[in-house]
Amino acid sequence: ISRKRMGFAGMKDKKARTRQWICISNMESEEQFRQVKDLEGTIYKTDFLKVVRGRKKLRMGQLKGNKFQILIRNIDDIEKSAEIANNILKELEVTGVPNYFGWQRFGKPRTNTHLVGEALVQNDLKEAVRRYIGNPTSEEHEENQKARQAYDDGNLEESLELMSKGMRYEKMMVRELIKDAKKGPLDDKAYKNALHALPKPLQRMFVHAYQSYLFNDAVSRRVAMGINRYVEGDIIIDNEERIVRDKTPEEFQNLIDNFEANPTSPLYGTKVPFAGGEVGEMEKSVLNSYN
């Protein structure tokens, strides 16, 4: 089954027990449908909970929300830990929680997805590819570090040979580079081809991760101004994510106190508005600090 025929609404955490719908397009015959059902038990650490027919293909972003159960391990004093957790929850009921993007957006243990996105935004395709394939870090297994170092040293064939099974996306890119290297020196077109060898959701994830990185920075700076305090110029949204307008500062503050509305930070892009006043200057300074 071609990867291009598969669709899903969002990426899931790698190190978690997750459940989601995945669709496969063009499954018209009953024989094809049966073949999918027969895959049960053949995919590593994957169970099929239900196989049904649908009318439309699932696409990235068609996600209503996520629901989590969080497990905390290696607790010495359960009662004391529960007391601490409850005290924290009581405080959060008053202040709220900053809506940061988590580690899964940036990659773990190798946190580099946003760095690839940064290079893409700067139109440095060669560096974007290097940051994904090369750039070894001590957080990875030694064999992966050697494969990445071989790439940085310019040894594409050796890098491919050293890559572990888990480096399937890196292998896709290196194979494309090896193919283009046989035609001549690698140029921007070759690096573009390497990036296009990746699944489209992953290609989009790079720039999304960089947006998220900038957003997290802006959130941290906004939290420093007071997470549950209205600041003149804030763009305020209600719980339906509609912009709230024409309120006095006191009315805005009352909405925030009652969790009926929230201050925002920008998910940076070409059409995203900045806040006004001090908050807007802060949001612009985030961009300036990475140029």
Q: For each of these PLM feature ranges, what is it?
A:
Residues 1-291:
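Non-catalytic, substrate/partner-engaging modules appended to enzymatic cores
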